């Protein structure tokens, strides 16, 4: 398949998934507002009718809770890529005292900056043995690129070029900002669920004489829990699907930048053949899994919430002739202890 066609398809699928997420969130908020605004009709019948006064009170409250949770997450994520790199144990590669491997990495970053038309970002080195990298930041101006020691020690110059080109694609295509928007929305829904949990606990422990009021509090708490946690669950599923499409887009764009499909294909094959794979050991590695070149952590929910496509599928999209075997990769211990 033509790599420009792959880019077009990935962008189209991303747009559909983002639209689905927006519609899902709006529907969830609308249903929640309506559920709290239903009342019995005044004509003596048992039919339910919509109390518009209640809508005027409930709607701003529900929207306000979701927005508050989203804004708190925004404030946390806007700190820039530097904060994320440091949380993952990254070390800034300074102008002085670079090793030959570090200098080669900086040269490649500068080459890819020129190819993509983006300013040269700050570069961090992670001490991990796994072959991995990431781009983080809210805008190209505060973006950083992080690369593991395993990547710069094990990959050839061409393979490392493919990895860096992939990360520049994420910066160029605005994937960092897109991820931040989705994370903020999901966090807002999660806060709605947490608010429901608090109401449920308080209502169930209440000694109020009016049992109907107590029951109403319990029901409100249960409904908010279901709405918030279900919303964040399905939002996370959509976010993971969007992330997988952006990985395909970044792979295809990396080929465009390097003009060499085997550069990124070779790096992916080495990940498959390396004992450490693309593993990142930092305590908060899972929090930033969607940023990595390849999955950096593993969990029981991998298939459901996978932020990256299957390694073999990514390779076959680039190298249709691949026979399915991974090269055996050994990493010299002496190179891993430089940090």
What positions do the PLM features span?
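Short pre-active-site segment immediately N-terminal to the catalytic Zn-binding motif
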Residues: 93-100, 149-162
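Envelope-exposed proteins and targeting segments
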Residues: 121, 141-143, 287-289
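Hydrophobic or amphipathic, alpha-helical segments that drive membrane association/targeting
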Residues: 1-138, 173, 178-244, 248, ...
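C-terminal capping/extension segments of zinc metalloprotease domains
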Residues: 1-9, 252, 256-266, 270, ...
